[in-house]
């Protein structure tokens, strides 16, 4: 084989092996099983969003001060107003990404028209990945219901609203989803409430929780009336890798 061809073959082979190694490493670096009772804030494990807004339907600015751990051993997200018609909100997310497994949270959402309290996984273009997301969302206008949803490479419209039979804002309950290659199952207090099997997300994402007020989405959330402060409470979070 001529020398130049040998060099080119080695370069191509090396590039392929490098790409394979990066892919394998990225997969290996997804987080393992954990349980966080929020007896304190682990800044090596979690990150607080701070100083920016998602824009569009989000009518608030994320502030680190709106994410706190209380003396009751819970994480609390706040929606506040520092000045007239300006709003600050809270978002907490994991440092690492997580893949297939069981995601659980014990929480109480905030109750008020025009707001969302959530627990979800997310990854997207800002992370250099497709937009994949799995949601548990409470629309504050009616906290006797929960909304499940997911996105695969940016394609959504998988909303499912489930009647809980209780007001989620009044007491802690456990909500979960089990994400597997061919399905997602959502649970409330250990009981399966919804199953999806079509176009399931594949990309590991960060575990996230947020509380925010909307704008321009009154048909979905209802109109936010400016009431504040409002709080969403999170007793614990658990992930079991499968």
Map each language-model feature to its residues.
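Repetitive helical segments and hydrophobic/amphipathic motifs
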Residues: 14-15, 115
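C-terminal segment of classical bacterial N-terminal signal peptides
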Residues: 17-25
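GH16 jelly-roll
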Residues: 27-242
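A hydrophobic membrane-anchoring feature enriched in long, contiguous, low-charge segments
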Residues: 4, 15-18, 75
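Bacterial N-terminal signal peptides that target proteins for export
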Residues: 1-12
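Conserved short hydrophobic patches within well-ordered secondary structure
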Residues: 5, 22, 185-187
């Amino acid at each position: 084989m001529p020398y130049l061809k040998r060099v080119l073959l080695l370069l191509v082979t090396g590039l392929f092996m490098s790409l394979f190694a990066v892919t394998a490493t990225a997969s290996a670096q997804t987080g393992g099983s954990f349980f966080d009772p929020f007896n304190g804030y682990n800044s090596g494990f979690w990150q607080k969003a701070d100083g920016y807004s998602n824009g569009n339907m989000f009518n608030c600015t994320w502030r680190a001060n709106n994410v706190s751990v209380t003396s009751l051993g819970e994480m609390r997200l706040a929606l506040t107003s520092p000045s007239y018609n300006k709003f600050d909100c809270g978002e907490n997310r994991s440092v690492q990404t997580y893949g297939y497994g069981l995601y659980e949270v014990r929480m109480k959402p905030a109750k008020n028209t025009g707001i969302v309290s959530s627990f979800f996984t997310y990854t997207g273009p800002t992370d250099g990945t497709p937009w994949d997301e799995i949601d548990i969302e409470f629309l504050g206008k009616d906290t006797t219901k929960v909304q499940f949803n997911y996105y695969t490479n940016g394609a959504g419209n998988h909303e499912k609203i489930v009647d809980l039979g209780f007001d989620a804002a009044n007491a802690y309950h456990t909500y979960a989803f089990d994400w597997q290659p061919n399905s997602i199952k959502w649970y409330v207090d250990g009981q399966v409430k919804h199953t999806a099997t079509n176009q399931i997300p594949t990309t590991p994402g960060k575990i996230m929780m947020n509380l925010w007020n909307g704008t321009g989405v009154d048909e979905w959330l209802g109109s936010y009336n400016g009431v504040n402060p409002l709080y969403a409470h999170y007793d614990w979070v658990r992930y079991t890798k499968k």
